[in-house]
């Protein structure tokens, strides 16, 4: 069983890796270089999440582009290059669709953005790392059929050639 830890805090990452975690789900960029070095030292993988801010607790809005992939690609290119310089050999890119942003409170806007990103995730594979996507719940859209949300989004993610669903 592979244990993963979701964090942007370096001390939490150290504790989790020391306890046996083999995957860090990095939800911030402020300490990414140190995180990559730490993961490499522990022979762990890192899921690099796209975050429009220093970490997922300090964001307000995300750009709502007609095509979000170029913006995400630019971010991931920088992070992958830095990770490689730090000795990290295993990683995933994650468009970060599960994070809260002020301008995605309207469920129709958020779901449209998520669907567009899922369907175009295959374009991130050119960066050389597999793509990971978290599956939304979309409670306000699916209501009592909320259990249908993850299968719905997993189909879109599969069409977009997502490598890892969580």
Regions found by a protein language model. Give the residues of each.
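Short acidic, glycine-rich surface-loop motifs adjacent to enzyme active sites
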Residues: 91-101
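Active-site-adjacent loop and "lid" segments of alpha/beta metabolic enzymes
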Residues: 1-2, 10, 17, 23-38, ...
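CE4/NodB-like, metal-dependent polysaccharide N-deacetylase domain
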Residues: 71-92
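Active-site loop-to-helix "anion-binding N-cap" substructures in soluble metabolic enzymes
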Residues: 7
């Amino acid at each position: 069983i592979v244990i993963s830890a979701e964090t942007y805090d370096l001390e939490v990452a150290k504790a989790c890796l020391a306890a046996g975690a083999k995957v860090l789900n990095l939800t911030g960029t402020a300490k990414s270089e140190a995180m990559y070095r730490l993961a490499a030292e522990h022979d762990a993988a890192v899921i690099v999440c796209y975050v429009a801010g220093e970490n997922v607790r300090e964001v307000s809005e995300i750009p709502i582009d007609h095509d979000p992939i170029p913006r995400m690609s630019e971010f991931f290119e920088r992070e992958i290059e830095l990770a490689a310089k730090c000795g990290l050999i295993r990683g995933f890119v994650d468009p970060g669709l599960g994070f809260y942003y002020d301008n995605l409170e309207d469920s129709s806007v958020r779901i449209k953005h998520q669907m567009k990103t899922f369907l175009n995730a295959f374009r991130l594979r050119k960066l050389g790392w597999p793509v990971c996507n978290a599956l939304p719940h979309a409670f306000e859209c699916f209501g009592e059929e909320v259990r249908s949300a993850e299968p719905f989004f997993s189909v879109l993610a599969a069409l977009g050639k997502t490598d890892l669903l969580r």
